[in-house]
């Protein structure tokens, strides 16, 4: 989702800084680069990285405040939606079931879908915040829940690739996102290029039987 459909890092940083000030737990200002550096990690790991000066209990307390502030802020203000996302999803939806799996907190995907009014394009969503499962487990869970026979995951960082392998699905790299992949896989230069991939059969070719 992050680095694939949009870049929310700047507004996430703004919202977390608001939450930090309100909490009074520490004096710290996060940057967009700080947030980009932890994109794709589970929320507990993010708290450990960004708030090492706090005890575990205090980190998790602040994390909860940050996540709530973030969800509310993004629902209202959004982030940077990559070019052609809505149009590309509309075309792909005619041929495929579309799903979102993320390591984010509960409510983050919903805030994204609410702001951009993209609910109609997705058949199901799942995230770490709902069940504390790792991304590979959630990809498999969602595939099983929806009776998928084959699937491919589009992601931007190495952890996404590892999760897709764990889940037994194919992988397409969003090369315009936040990371690189240490293997040879189909790579997108833009999200819109998925339509070209589809015309060439690249999406179908990247799928793996489940």
List where the protein language model places each region:
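Asp-based, Mg2+/Mn2+-dependent phosphohydrolase catalytic module
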Residues: 106, 110-210
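N-terminal helical cap/lid subdomain that shapes the substrate entry/recognition surface
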Residues: 1-83
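Short beta->alpha linker loops
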Residues: 38, 80-84, 104-105, 130-131, ...
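Short, acidic loop-to-helix structural element flanking the phosphoryl-transfer center
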Residues: 72-100, 110, 136
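Conserved phosphate-coupling serine/threonine residues in phosphotransfer and NTP-handling enzymes
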Residues: 4, 102-104
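Structured helix-beta-strand junction loops
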Residues: 41, 69, 94-95, 149
């Amino acid at each position: 989702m992050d680095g694939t459909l949009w870049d929310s890092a700047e507004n996430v940083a703004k919202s977390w800084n608001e939450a930090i000030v309100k909490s009074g737990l520490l004096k710290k200002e996060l940057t967009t680069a700080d947030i980009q550096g932890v994109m794709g990690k589970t929320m507990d790991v993010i708290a450990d990285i960004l708030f090492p000066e706090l005890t575990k209990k205090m980190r998790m307390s602040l994390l909860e405040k940050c996540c709530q502030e973030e969800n509310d802020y993004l629902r209202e203000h959004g982030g940077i939606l990559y070019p052609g996302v809505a149009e590309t999803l509309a075309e792909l939806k005619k041929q495929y079931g579309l799903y979102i799996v993320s390591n984010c907190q509960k409510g983050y995907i919903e805030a994204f879908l609410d702001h951009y009014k993209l609910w109609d394009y997705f058949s199901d969503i799942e995230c770490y915040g709902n069940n504390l499962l790792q991304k590979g487990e959630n990809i498999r869970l969602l595939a099983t829940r929806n009776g998928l026979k084959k699937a491919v995951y589009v992601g931007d960082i190495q952890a996404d690739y590892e999760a897709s392998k764990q889940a037994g699905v194919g992988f397409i790299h969003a090369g315009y996102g936040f990371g690189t992949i240490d293997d040879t896989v189909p790579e997108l230069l833009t999200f819109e290029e998925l339509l070209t991939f589809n015309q060439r059969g690249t999406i179908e070719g990247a799928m793996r039987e489940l």
